Amino acid sequence: MHCPFCGANDTKVIDSRLVAEGEQVRRRRECLACGERFTTFETAELVLPRLIKTDGSRQPFDEEKLRAGMQRALEKRPVSVERLESSLVHIKHKLRATGEREVKSLVVGELVMAELQKLDEVAYIRFASVYRRFQDLNEFREEIDRLAREPVKE
């Protein structure tokens, strides 16, 4: 680490502590050349994978697009913003946990459906009807019957 005072390359870590709920490391450093002390903060760069669309095109992950789609499904439903944000964090965590640089958009769609099913079954059906392109009432009935049979996976 370069010293911000004299530009020397040799610094020594005097103290390290976790801060920001363990998301950051605070380090107290001392320059071996000039003796000045300074603080650095380190955070991991967590990059979300790019999405591979069904047509084969690739695009960066867009959190706002994800949020808007979920909000549309949850419109006029009794789900708090906090619960929605928690679901978004959960989806992003699962995407990062894949360790992949690219994931199929279908993976994101399935993660959204799983989260919406936990949040609100009506919102889940709304999203599923568009996502899975329901063509008639029978497809709605089949999905509702499946929901009634299968417990929600936490």
From Swiss-Prot:
Coiled-coil portions: none
PROSITE patterns: ATP_CONE
Cofactor dependency: Zn(2+)
Domain of life the protein comes from: Bacteria
Keywords assigned by UniProt, alphabetized: ATP-binding, DNA-binding, Metal-binding, Nucleotide-binding, Repressor, Transcription, Transcription regulation, Zinc, Zinc-finger
First and last residues of each zinc finger (unnamed): 3-34
One BP term from GO: negative regulation of DNA-templated transcription
ATP-cone domain mapped to chain residues: 49-139
Free-text comment on the cofactor: Binds 1 zinc ion.
GO MF, one example: DNA binding
Keyword Ion transport: no
Family the entry assigns: Belongs to the NrdR family.
Function text: Negatively regulates transcription of bacterial ribonucleotide reductase nrd genes and operons by binding to NrdR-boxes.
Xref: PANTHER family: TRANSCRIPTIONAL REPRESSOR NRDR
Record protein name field: Transcriptional repressor NrdR
Organism expressing this protein natively: Pseudomonas fluorescens (strain Pf0-1)
Gene: nrdR
